[in-house]
């Protein structure tokens, strides 16, 4: 069966069976996706993003295999498992078809057909199905006894048995299924009396569109409204055509028996078949929409986590506000809290001179290099206030997304970090740290609270969590972490660690001081050879005695670099420092049965830029000073903005006011765009033009087409 899995995954993904087999072997051996992707390229044939797809396909096939086992056991217990049926089940890997095969044998709650069978009406149903008897009423009279009160009662029971038979027939189900697939219409109507409550869904009050053309965001919006009891939703094909197809299959005579069967077919379609297939399509379309939404969310999260960091600078974090003032914190270059203060530069208090004096004192005393202002209430006013002041030090001012900061400030992680401070201080610290290192700070927050998803509360939560966790893990390992400063929460996402080992590393660091080498990791309690293999390459030690400990070169490959240095008559440190020496390296000399060119290329790239951060430098940004509210917007106005969220129908842009504007997919570029990520990315600075403004619904339509500069 495992070999069958390899063949099926290979066919589905267009990857060789050998690559599938090797990759699954590594996964089964406990290797993580980041480790395999980075350090086992020779084994997998250079697979990267496909590794996750291989794992997902394998898990789905394994689930199907378990389901088949359950089905076979159930039918076996009924004594109905024939060799032919067993072979058919074993050869079927399509879940829908598998359930169709199983349906006649599936244990049921008491149905109308089952009740009719218990009354002894199955022979009558069989007689009707043969459609040879000219006078079925006369034959039905012989069944009038006990609970069967009259002839019509007998015929009705027989029709119920036929209706169930029709609904469980594979060909019949496929016929109706094909009709749904080709011509299924999704219809939504507002629930009577709920018009006012459902205002935000008014686009769907009387909606009718092809299911196969319905975009995922529309489908999820409709399903959300349905769940809230505001819309009635249905999916339907051409009912007449479906019934005609079924009648052609089951009705073979125009006589009285044929008429009974035709009546049973119509009942079967309306009462059993159509609702069953409608549920199937509702589930499948929702699953597809979920997958698309989760994919969008994961990509947005990836871009957000890989946003450019300011780095190890002294930062002032400000959580702005009007009535309650602005909470200000000062952080050292490692993000440790040095000081916190409240200032009140805005109405109703308006103590601007006092606020400036406090800021001046903090900036000088703590040698602040940059200020991070949260982008919530009073953000623009606070930015403007700071930019109008002349401080004795040059400082850069940044606007930082504070989405999820309040969630973090009330979390256990925040309480453990700052047990003696309230939520306002913790929130301001989070804003400051997000500027220094977005990745290290955002991993502390449930990704669903970061606000870059599309209907994230409506999709399958288990699948969403799995995808987002894998995204965080991929990002953390792509960047790597400083072994001597990383929090236990950040370390948790490092390949091969997890919560317990991450905490053990932090405890070891607290008791023994900073790590001086990667080898020292082996002294951490419960750190075995396998965990070390998986994590070591992603952990950096900037001041280590061995310079390779601050690179992505894995300890298992140190001997290769050492041999390169030896062959050139220099030390490893000299090799890293001297570009001319590195040019003399002939990588093919270091090939071996276990080390191929992919690994050697990665090593040489790492020696070129040891410990390189893939995230790039941060840029300062300014909003238009003349736009403060939605009422300041005019059609045709051009504005600077920052992409805050991406969906499959476009991108939402922060233009410095409370409401974000939407650039629809069709307005991202002159050319056809199928995926917004082809044009924009999270946190990208863009220039946009205002297309329309709906102040009542707080909706702003923007375009990037025909924008100057």
PLM regions with names:
Residues 50-53, 60, 64-317, 323-421, ...:
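Duplex nucleic acid-engaging cores and interfaces of nucleic-acid transaction enzymes
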Residues 1-21, 28:
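Generic start-of-chain signal for non-secretory N-termini
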Residues 541-709:
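Single-stranded RNA-binding regions, centering on S1/OB-family and related RNA-binding modules
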Residues 2-5, 56-81, 90, 416-514, ...:
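Long, highly charged, low-complexity intrinsically disordered interaction regions
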Residues 178-185, 318-322, 376-381, 400-407, ...:
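A glycine-rich phosphate-binding loop feature that marks nucleotide/adenosyl-phosphate handling sites
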Residues 74, 99-101, 225-238, 248-273, ...:
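Structured, non-catalytic alpha/beta "coupling" segments that mediate domain-domain communication
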Residues 39-41, 129, 238, 320, ...:
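Short, ordered loop/turn segments at secondary-structure junctions
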